[in-house]
């Protein structure tokens, strides 16, 4: 395979893990970061100890503080940053891009102020003439396991399947299997909203409830995700795949999950500010819960689990009381019409 340069915007765990994959595939990954300490550590020690402890990076993984240097000559630009920085980084990227480029984003969230998905934010901020294609790379994955080269599957979603196949070809190897799909909306809705349900799973575990409770929460949570997704144009079948139920399972059941860990602390009685300070990293589900709270009301979508998690996060609702209210809701038939 011909070596290709790929720029990765974001020196966190996911950006660094994807850079490792590209280096394993004999490509040339360049990470753009904004902290001297991390950029220097990647270049000099071939580690990123804050985000991926104990992982030794291939020497081919390089990092830079210069956005221009990172994207110069890159076939693909991967945007691997927290959702709250997406708009400002895309403004910078729009200024820096000199020619049409395949853009890939791996950020899972909804912009609270606008209810926009991340691809919509990117489309607003980056000129169409500079976007050869926009691909969502998502699925059941923890960066820690990708960096350890454990078997993982993802889905590259794009309206232009030929662009999705280019991304598939650059990242696929014996450890990372990539599928393609054309349902961008479904991939983004599944990836963003599962973080809310993962907070709920963590809360349930923190309260000491068992597997029955978590299984119910995940299953009915998936129904809520699908309801909203279909209402905004997703294919319901997408939620049965990697970017739907697959991503939900891994995020609700693993100690690697920031959202599960944050929820677990909340369930044990800590308040949100304490939890976020202890985490020291972005917990996307908190921001997404705020966005979806208003969005669901606007669309008149029934999302009782999501609403309960919002109330725990932002209205000081007691977690046990929230569970009692969910369990005491009016009886219903388990049937969805899509």
UniProtKB/Swiss-Prot annotation:
Binding site for sn-glycerol 3-phosphate: 108, 139, 141, 194, 247, 257-259
GO biological process, one term: phospholipid biosynthetic process
EC top class, as a word: oxidoreductase
Keyword flag Ribosomal protein: no
GO molecular function, one term: NAD binding
Catalytic activity annotation: sn-glycerol 3-phosphate + NAD(+) = dihydroxyacetone phosphate + NADH + H(+); sn-glycerol 3-phosphate + NADP(+) = dihydroxyacetone phosphate + NADPH + H(+)
Pathway: Membrane lipid metabolism; glycerophospholipid metabolism
Main location group: cytoplasm
UniProt KW keywords: Cytoplasm, Lipid biosynthesis, Lipid metabolism, NAD, NADP, Nucleotide-binding, Oxidoreductase, Phospholipid biosynthesis, Phospholipid metabolism
Source organism, top-level taxon: Bacteria
Entry binding sites for NADPH: 13-14, 108, 143, 258, 282, 284
Location of the protein in the cell: Cytoplasm
Enzyme Commission code: 1.1.1.94
Active site: 194
This protein's record includes keyword Acyltransferase: no
Role according to the record: Catalyzes the reduction of the glycolytic intermediate dihydroxyacetone phosphate (DHAP) to sn-glycerol 3-phosphate (G3P), the key precursor for phospholipid synthesis.
Family assignment from sequence similarity: Belongs to the NAD-dependent glycerol-3-phosphate dehydrogenase family.
Protein name: Glycerol-3-phosphate dehydrogenase [NAD(P)+]
The organism of origin for this protein: Listeria monocytogenes serovar 1/2a (strain ATCC BAA-679 / EGD-e)
């Amino acid at each position: 395979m011909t070596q290709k340069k790929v720029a990765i915007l974001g020196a966190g765990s996911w950006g660094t893990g994807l850079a490792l994959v590209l280096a394993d595939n004999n490509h040339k990954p360049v990470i753009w970061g904004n902290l001297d300490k991390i950029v220097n550590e990647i270049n000099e020690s071939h580690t990123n100890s804050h985000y991926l402890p104990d992982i030794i990076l291939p020497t081919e993984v390089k990092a830079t503080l210069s956005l221009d240097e990172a994207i110069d000559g890159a076939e693909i630009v991967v945007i691997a940053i927290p959702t709250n920085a997406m708009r400002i980084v895309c403004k910078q990227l729009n200024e820096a891009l000199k020619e049409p480029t395949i853009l890939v984003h791996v950020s899972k969230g909804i912009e609270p102020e606008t209810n926009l998905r991340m691809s919509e934010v990117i489309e607003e901020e980056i000129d169409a003439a500079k976007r050869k294609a926009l691909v969502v790379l998502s699925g059941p994955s923890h960066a820690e396991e990708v960096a350890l080269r454990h078997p993982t599957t993802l889905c590259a979603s794009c309206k232009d399947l030929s662009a999705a196949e280019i991304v598939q070809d650059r990242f696929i190897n014996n450890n990372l299997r990539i599928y393609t799909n054309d349902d961008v909306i479904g991939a983004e809705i599944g990836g963003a909203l599962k973080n809310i349900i993962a907070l709920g799973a963590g809360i349930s575990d923190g309260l000491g409830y068992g597997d029955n409770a978590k299984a119910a929460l995940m299953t009915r949570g998936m129904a809520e995700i699908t309801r909203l997704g279909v209402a905004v144009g997703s294919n319901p079948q997408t939620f049965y795949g990697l970017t739907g139920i697959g991503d939900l399972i891994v995020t609700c059941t693993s100690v690697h999950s920031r959202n599960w860990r944050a929820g677990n602390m909340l369930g044990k009685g800590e308040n949100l500010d304490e939890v976020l300070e202890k985490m020291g990293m972005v917990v996307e589900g908190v921001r997404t819960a705020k966005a979806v709270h208003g969005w669901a009301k606007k669309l008149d979508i029934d999302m009782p689990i999501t609403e309960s998690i919002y109330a725990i996060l932002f209205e000081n609702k007691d977690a046990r009381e929230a569970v009692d209210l969910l369990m005491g809701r009016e009886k219903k038939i388990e049937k969805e019409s899509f």
